[in-house]
Amino acid sequence: MSRRKSPDSPLFQLEPVLPDFSFEITAKRDGFWPVAGADEAGRGPLAGPVVAAAVILDPDAVPGGLNDSKLLTAEQREALFTEIMATATVSIASSSAAHIDATDILKASLDAMRRAIDGLSIAARFALIDGRDVPQGLPCHAKAIVKGDSRSVSIAAASIVAKVTRDRMMARADATFPAYGFALHAGYATVRHRSAIDSHGPCSLHRMSFRPFREAQEQPLAVSTGPIDPN
């Protein structure tokens, strides 16, 4: 009788599945080209904008190692960001904390993705959108793909561009609002960030429609010395 293979056997050591060009190829076969991938970064933080990117990759110059930005190190993201910006058509848009508060985080995210796709210097004929929802008012056909940043290389590239751009914006915001440590946590609800909010109250970058701010609307805002350049 043969013995069952152990899960530690090399036969069970499968390579991780990386995003590929399948969705883009299907769209091209259906007569839609070029194809853009779109994704956002920063839906969950308590502070800062949500940033969206749209990317049209050159099929002959797709950077190696593209993946969901959350699965990459900061160093890997920075290196891929540089390569994407050098070889692809890229557009970036953002929705501020005030925009998020005036609408909601989903609407603000979808609006940023729409503006990013609209802003491409080469018009996309099809857009692959990360998530369950397609932004309204797009200038092209589109398809929403759940976990698209781990399935489509174009969406993966957009996720990297959005993440690196937002992290850089929050690092610059740290100079204007040094008490909050934005360069360390990018506005996410870390212990340090929550402690700073408890000590100093919210600032103008905080999303007042998010908890815990709904119960602290009366606290004074920190004063910005000027606008924060998103680039």
Swiss-Prot record:
Residue intervals of the RNase H type-2 domain: 33-222
Reactions performed catalytically: Endonucleolytic cleavage to 5'-phosphomonoester
Keyword set includes Transferase: no
PROSITE patterns: RNASE_H_2
Localization of this protein: Cytoplasm
Main location: cytoplasm
Entry GO CC: cytoplasm; ribonuclease H2 complex
GO molecular function terms noted in the UniProt entry: manganese ion binding; RNA binding; RNA-DNA hybrid ribonuclease activity
Gene3D superfamilies given in the database record: Ribonuclease H-like superfamily/Ribonuclease H
Pfam families: RNase_HII (PF01351)
Entry's cofactor comment: Manganese or magnesium. Binds 1 divalent metal ion per monomer in the absence of substrate. May bind a second metal ion after substrate binding.
GO BP, one annotated term: mismatch repair
Keywords: Cytoplasm, Endonuclease, Hydrolase, Manganese, Metal-binding, Nuclease
E.C. numbers: 3.1.26.4
Cofactor annotation: Mn(2+); Mg(2+)
Function, in words: Endonuclease that specifically degrades the RNA of RNA-DNA hybrids.
NCBIfam families named in the record: PRK00015.1-3
Family classification: Belongs to the RNase HII family.
Name of the protein in question: Ribonuclease HII
Taxonomic source organism: Sinorhizobium fredii (strain NBRC 101917 / NGR234)
Lineage, opening ranks: Bacteria, Pseudomonadati, Pseudomonadota, Alphaproteobacteria, Hyphomicrobiales
Gene: rnhB
